[in-house]
Design a protein with these regions (language model features):
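Active-site/ligand-binding-proximal alpha/beta "capping" segment
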Residues: 111-156, 230-242
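Conserved N-terminal beta1-alpha1 strand-loop-helix module at the mouth
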Residues: 1-26
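Active-site pocket-lining/capping segments in soluble small-molecule metabolic enzymes
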Residues: 100-127, 177-229, 234, 264-270
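Active-site-adjacent beta->alpha loops and helix N-cap segments on the catalytic face
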Residues: 5-7, 32-44, 63-70, 89-113, ...
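Active-site beta-loop-alpha junctions enriched in small/polar residues
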Residues: 1, 27-31, 56-62, 87-88, ...
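Conserved beta-strand positions in the central sheet of alpha/beta enzyme cores
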Residues: 25, 83-84, 156, 248
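Active-site mouth loops of central-metabolism enzymes
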Residues: 1-8, 53-65, 121-139, 215-230
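Conserved, mostly hydrophobic/aromatic
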Residues: 24, 74, 147, 151, ...
Length: 270
């Protein structure tokens, strides 16, 4: 959110270009707090590198008129891909509440977005370990099916650390008649306290064996990073062998861990 922060982000992107990424995704702050700059960032990434960017859009704090105006701006800037999410409650709120004149569900947002060429490609979130607010996996899958039926072109999953969770989720999607590509999302563990906070919020689990290794190395940042990167590399290799359409890395503006994961897989060597 500062000029220095933006330049650090662009530098991270520069370092990842050797791996020929298929796209970048760009979030914005809680409650849409950086919604405007998101469009600037997406435009700048495309200008610098010519790589597609998927801009995140949520229902939080926005009316239908707000969302439609934002989509018009995105289209005018050449942004062709949208990640449509309901969004998390703003800080200080325990549960999501739609604003007057707004939308309450991601499938409604998907339905609002003009899809298909020359409009937008639409991605939606999937939850291998079930969305934290869903009462069970069946309800969560019904919600995902509604998003896909509303016009989503692909599913990008929340982070996970056990590939069997993803494979089970992928099988459940197939049984539900979901045929769009399902892209797994990985976050290499470098900052263990940070990842513990994230997984606690989204109800994702860290396998006990991995957790114990990380806990034992918590006072040694280099060891922690090595463990996390090694685990992510094994995950990515296994997923690619299993035929996923690609892997979406949650870089969080810090490219070093993802770079090491990809290098360990033999990528980026020309």
């Amino acid at each position: 959110k500062t000029p220095a922060g933006y330049e650090a982000m662009y530098a991270s992107i520069d370092r990842l270009m050797v791996f020929k990424p298929g796209f970048f995704s760009c979030t914005y702050g809680a409650g849409g707090s950086t919604q405007g700059p998101t469009l600037d960032i997406c435009s700048e990434i495309m200008r610098r590198h010519g790589v597609p960017v998927m801009a995140h859009l949520t229902c939080v704090g926005s009316t239908v008129a707000d969302l439609t105006a934002w989509l018009d701006q995105a289209r005018d800037r050449g942004i062709a891909n949208i990640m449509a999410l309901r969004g998390d409650p703003p800080q200080g709120q325990e549960s999501f509440t739609k604003v007057e004149g707004g939308l309450g569900y991601a499938n409604e947002l998907v339905g609002l977005i003009p899809s298909g060429v020359p409009d937008f490609g639409i991605g939606v979130g999937g939850y291998p370990e079930v969305h934290q607010e869903a009462p069970n996996a069946a309800v969560d899958m019904d919600n995902l099916k509604r998003k896909v039926d509303a016009g989503a072109d692909a599913v990008v999953t929340q982070l996970f650390y056990e590939n069997t969770d993803f494979f089970r989720f992928r099988d459940q999607c197939a049984k539900a008649g979901i045929t769009v590509p399902i892209v797994p999302g990985l976050l290499p563990i470098v900052n263990f306290p940070q990842v513990k906070r994230i997984t606690s919020l989204c109800k994702a689990r860290i396998p006990s064996e991995l957790y114990e290794k990380l806990e034992a190395s918590k006072d040694n940042p280099e060891s922690t990073a090595a463990i996390g990167i090694r685990h992510a590399a094994r995950q990515a290799e296994d997923l690619l062998k299993a035929g996923v359409p690609g892997v979406h890395f949650y870089v969080l503006n810090q490219s070093e861990a993802t770079r090491k994961v990809l290098e360990s897989l033999g990528m980026g060597r020309g």
